[in-house]
Every structure is written in structure tokens, then in C-alpha cells.
Amino acid sequence: AESGFQPVVDRKGD
């Protein structure tokens, strides 16, 4: 959720 892949499930990982 830091790069902008899925801000809807902000869970730092991908």
C-alpha cells in the first residue's frame, strides 16, 4: 500500500 498497488487494503507487504 506504499507503492500504490491497493490503497483499499493498506497492509504493507507487496
UniProtKB/Swiss-Prot annotation:
It is found in: Plastid, Chloroplast thylakoid. One of its GO terms (cellular component) is chloroplast thylakoid. Keywords: Chloroplast, Plastid, Thylakoid. On the 2D-gel the determined pI of this protein is: 8.5, its MW is: 16.9 kDa. This is Unknown protein from spot 204 of 2D-PAGE of thylakoid.
